[in-house]
Amino acid sequence: MPTPSMEDYIEQIYILIEEKGYARVSDIAEALSVHPSSVTKMVQKLDKDEYLVYEKYRGLVLTPKGKKIGQRLVYRHELLEQFLRLIGVNEENIYHDVEGIEHHLSWNAIDRIGDLVQYFQEDERRIEALRNIQKRNEQGE
């Protein structure tokens, strides 16, 4: 199982490959706001752990194992953003909040959050009812 730091790298590499067709060390460093030397060290570790194949100066490719985890990590991130929007978290807080919680939830918790998001999306009246509760609670403060 990858560490939270490894997950951040795998997720970002997956996103870059999906968007651009490739992921370079410099692109990863820029996206994660870290030094290229840190990226190189982590990429070597991810290569050793078979999440990707890295050839110096030639780039990297996610293995099937890395792709599968990358997809799941992107899903988790997007689901948590969706959930926080659904429950009315201010837009300017969402990214930071997701980054703060995503590594601390079990996959079981993520799946249950997915169920809850689906529950609300299946009937707009449920979302309206939640908004009404939130308005009442805010007025009561």
Swiss-Prot record:
Q: Tell me the keywords, alphabetical order.
A: Activator, Cytoplasm, DNA-binding, Manganese, Metal-binding, Repressor, Transcription, Transcription regulation
Where does the UniProt entry say this protein principally localizes? cytoplasm
UniProt xrefs under SMART domains: HTH_DTXR
Which GO CC terms are listed, alphabetically? cytoplasm
Q: Which GO terms describe its biological process?
A: intracellular manganese ion homeostasis
Cell location: Cytoplasm
Q: Which residues form the HTH dtxR-type domain?
A: 1-63
User: Which InterPro entries does this chain map to?
Assistant: DtxR_MntR_Metal-Reg (IPR050536), Fe_dep_repressor (IPR001367), Fe_dep_repressor_sf (IPR036421), HTH_DTXR (IPR022687), HTH_tscrpt_reg_MntR (IPR022897), Iron_dep_repressor (IPR022689), WH-like_DNA-bd_sf (IPR036388), WH_DNA-bd_sf (IPR036390)
Which positions in this protein are listed as binding Mn(2+) 1?
8, 99, 102-103
Residues that, per the record, bind Mn(2+) 2: 11, 77, 99, 102
The Swiss-Prot or TrEMBL record describes its family as follows: Belongs to the DtxR/MntR family.
Q: What does this protein do?
A: Central regulator of manganese homeostasis.
Q: How does it assemble?
A: Homodimer.
Name listed for the protein in its UniProt record:
HTH-type transcriptional regulator MntR
> What organism, scientifically named, is this protein from?
Geobacillus thermodenitrificans (strain NG80-2)
